[in-house]
Amino acid sequence: CSGRAYSGAHPIVSGAGIHCSYICLSGAMICTEDGKACTSIPLTPGNLADIDRILTDAGIFMDIMTSNGVYCTFPREERLQRIYRFFDDGSLAAGQPSAALEQAVSRFASAFTFVGSLADVPSGTVIYKIGSTEIPAETVIRLKERFSACPDIATASTFPTDIELTNVRAQKGLALKAFARERSILPGEIMVLGDSDNDLSMFTPEFGWTVAMGNAQDCLKAVAKYETK
């Protein structure tokens, strides 16, 4: 289960020699090993209107994950700087990004199409997930409080300083249960591992083993059956 799109998750997983299906975009899409979508739950027009209103009111830029790649309302240079910081291998402090860092940033940034607003995403594009990064943690808390008034939108975070938004039916835990049910796998036979708030929907009692990583957020450790050392 990943918050990433298939295109972002597959190279990492396959590079480790693992061959499997993928629950992507925080549960909004389930894909076969070769990337064919089996099921998908996009954001509805009502979801999009609420997300646009709340994030725009707060001055928050968006990464918009769609059927046609990622659209971004951030100013291009600002988004690129955030990507550099995310992938920094220590070379930024020396004032000269390493070749490996430049390559990573170029590869990641190539997936983005920059637009002025959510309304500029081409008509007919299916939108699965919207997120934003490097937000003050207290602002994330306030945003989640505002979205709590939208019961058909699920909110999550990989870090305390980001926010991820999907349809309420598109959550990792729900997608994992559906995936297992189709294959006659009982929840009690499943081991779940996670480290952040966006894994919470999988950390429910019916799963046999819920394992929080040693560096997991406290909210996950509080509900996990086990914790790594």
Which residues does each predicted region cover?
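Short, acidic/turn-prone active-site loops that include or flank metal/cofactor-
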Residues: 26-29, 160, 215-218
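Short, structured coil segments at secondary-structure junctions
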Residues: 16-18, 26, 58, 150-151, ...
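Short, charged, surface-exposed secondary-structure boundary motifs
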Residues: 31-34, 166, 220-227
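Active-site phosphate-binding/coordination module
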Residues: 1-95
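Short hydrophobic/aromatic-enriched beta-strand-loop microsegments
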Residues: 19-25, 155, 210-214
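Acidic, Mg2+-coordinating phosphoryl-transfer loop and its flanking beta/alpha structural elements
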Residues: 2, 176, 186-229
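Hydrophobic packing residues within well-ordered alpha-helices of enzyme cores
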Residues: 9-13, 143, 220
